């Protein structure tokens, strides 16, 4: 691990920082001894090196950029450095601190009595993120992200540094980084090394676009700590074993990478939607409905399941509770719970844009422009129109239209076959009705007074007379008819008069 700086005016400040680092290492060593782990962790070394790098921010001739790459979208920048072996680690750390992320740093700083120290945050992939406090020169608070390192593969001292920042921004733009000066540059106060590195940066960007060599070296993100062969030496006097290349830390697929981050964190059991039974009373039913519920499929306690697909959008729930094991649920509702809908026929009744289906528990709202009306509506449309001049009557059936046309033409094809009767009729039902006048058949019987009629319309008119005088509902008339039939069929009725005694 290199020293904070042997020359320069910041020796006193560097000594203070080293005291803080030694206190941190002492505390970490004490914690590791308590946990029966005597090996110094790699994250501690990286934290100390990040603190050492802080000593050079106040001596820079240029201000540190605020998120140089994060505002321009997903940009991958490679920096090629050709420097001497002793100077390479210092440039490496100065460049690594520029690989920063958007300024939303986590509020996980560790309190201390003296100078604030950086806090170490390890994400789900094992990459260490070090939050640095603001520098005295007014530098912004940023995050420094370390990339995974590999052991040196040869005597070459060329190092490729890659900054990967995924951030929502604008179109990518070329980025220039102010580089950290080495010890020799601080002593001579010259910017030749910075200009040389910027030239290498532009040349490398052109080369990368031409041959795409860096594309073949992309690997998926791995933990920053290697299992063996640590890249940072623990001795202050040794500077050997520095990496020759830095692997690019890019996810292969953003969607799959996000799923891998989220999946192992927490697994929340998803409960089923609630049971929502909504029953609307209909006139004549006394507000009593039976709701048939399917047996639930092993739901945990407290979860509820919906029955109707359209019940979730209704605004007036009636019953809400846990699912029943099995069987039938009877819901008894007061008559004033819901507004009484109009009585509908057995097929379909339309009220404006509301379609009341025969067995539906709630009305289904359909737009008048939609072509999804039930099939029964098409069968009840008046498609047959009379084309006689001045008559535009419509009918449901073609036979009815033909019978109507005979009234215009005067045609009467149905003739009575009774002896001495030559009457003709335009419709067959009229002929059948006329035949009953010859036979005397009266097939329509009143259920109240047992009067018989030849025609059904005559019976309807007679029954209406009963309803207006006695105010007897139709179902009571049917019950009275059944009672009379039962009394007539029972032998030895008590209502029969007793024979007179002689």
UniProtKB/Swiss-Prot annotation:
Keyword Transcription regulation carried by entry: yes
Keywords: Activator, Apoptosis, DNA-binding, Metal-binding, Nucleus, Repeat, Repressor, Transcription, Transcription regulation, Zinc, Zinc-finger
SMART domains linked: ZnF_C2H2 (SM00355)
GO molecular function annotation: DNA binding; DNA-binding transcription factor activity; DNA-binding transcription factor activity, RNA polymerase II-specific; transcription cis-regulatory region binding; zinc ion binding
Alphabetical list of InterPro entries matching this protein: Znf_C2H2_sf, Znf_C2H2_type
Zinc fingers classed as C2H2-type: ranges: 384-408, 414-438, 444-466
A Gene Ontology BP annotation from the UniProt entry: apoptotic process
Inducers of expression: By TGF-beta. Expressed in a circadian manner in the kidney and epididymal fat tissue.
Transmembrane stretches, start-end: none
UniProt key word Repressor: yes
Pfam families (UniProt xref): zf-C2H2
GO cellular component, one term: nucleus
Null allele phenotype: Mice breed normally and are fertile. Hematopoiesis at all stages of development is normal and there is no effect on globin gene expression or longevity.
Cellular compartment(s): Nucleus
Region Disordered, annotated ranges: 133-156, 169-194
Family per record: Belongs to the Sp1 C2H2-type zinc-finger protein family.
Subunit structure of this chain's protein: Interacts with SIN3A.
Physiological role: Transcription factor. Activates the epsilon- and gamma-globin gene promoters and, to a much lower degree, the beta-globin gene and represses promoters containing SP1-like binding sites inhibiting cell growth. Represses transcription of SMAD7 which enhances TGF-beta signaling. Induces apoptosis.
Protein name, UniProt field: Krueppel-like factor 11
Protein's organism: Mus musculus
């Amino acid at each position: 691990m290199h020293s904070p700086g042997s020359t320069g005016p910041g020796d006193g400040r560097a000594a203070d920082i080293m005291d803080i680092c030694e206190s941190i290492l002492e505390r970490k060593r004490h914690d590791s001894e308590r946990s029966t782990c005597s090996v110094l962790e790699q994250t501690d070394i990286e934290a100390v090196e990040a603190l050492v790098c802080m000593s050079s921010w106040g001596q820079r001739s240029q201000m540190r950029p605020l998120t140089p790459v994060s505002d321009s979208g997903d940009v991958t920048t490679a920096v090629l450095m050709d420097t001497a072996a002793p100077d390479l680690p210092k440039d490496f750390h100065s460049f690594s601190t520029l690989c920063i992320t958007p300024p939303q740093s986590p509020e996980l700083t560790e309190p201390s009595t003296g100078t604030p120290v950086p806090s170490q945050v390890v994400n789900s992939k094992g990459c260490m993120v070090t939050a640095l406090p603001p520098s005295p020169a007014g530098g912004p608070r940023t995050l420094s992200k370390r990339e995974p390192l590999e052991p040196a593969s040869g005597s070459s001292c060329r190092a490729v540094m890659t900054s990967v920042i995924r951030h929502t921004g604008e179109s990518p733009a070329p980025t220039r980084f102010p580089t950290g000066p080495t010890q020799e540059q601080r002593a001579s106060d010259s910017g030749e090394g910075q200009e040389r590195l910027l030239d290498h940066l532009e040349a490398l960007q052109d080369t990368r676009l031409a041959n795409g060599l860096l594309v073949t070296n992309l690997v998926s993100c791995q933990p920053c700590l290697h299992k063996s062969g640590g890249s940072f030496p623990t001795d202050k006097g040794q500077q050997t074993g520095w990496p020759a290349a830095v692997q690019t830390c890019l996810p292969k697929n953003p969607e799959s990478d996000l799923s891998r981050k989220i999946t192992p964190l927490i697994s929340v059991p998803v409960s089923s939607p609630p049971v929502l039974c909504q029953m609307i009373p209909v006139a004549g039913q006394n507000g009593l409905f039976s709701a048939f519920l399917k047996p639930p499929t092993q739901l945990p306690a407290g979860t509820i399941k919906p029955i109707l697909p359209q019940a979730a959008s209704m605004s007036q729930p009636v019953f809400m509770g846990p699912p029943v094991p099995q069987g039938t649920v009877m819901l008894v509702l007061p008559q004033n719970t819901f507004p009484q809908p109009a009585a509908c026929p057995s097929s379909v009744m339309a009220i404006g844009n509301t379609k009341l289906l025969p067995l539906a528990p709630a009305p289904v709202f359909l737009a008048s422009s939609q072509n999804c009306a039930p099939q029964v509506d098409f069968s009840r449309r008046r498609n047959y129109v009379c084309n006689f001049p001045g008559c535009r009557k419509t009918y449901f059936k073609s036979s009815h239209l033909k019978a109507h046309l005979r009234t215009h033409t005067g045609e009467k094809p149905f003739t009575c076959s009774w002896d001495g009767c030559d009457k003709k009729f335009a419709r067959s039902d009229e002929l059948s009705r006329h035949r009953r006048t010859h036979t005397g058949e009266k097939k329509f019987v009143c259920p109240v007074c047992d009067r018989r009629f030849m025609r059904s319309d005559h019976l309807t008119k007679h029954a209406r007379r009963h309803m207006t005088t006695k105010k007897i509902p139709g179902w009571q008339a049917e019950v009275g008819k059944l009672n009379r039939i039962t009394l007539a069929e029972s032998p030895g009725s008590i209502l029969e008069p007793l024979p007179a005694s002689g």
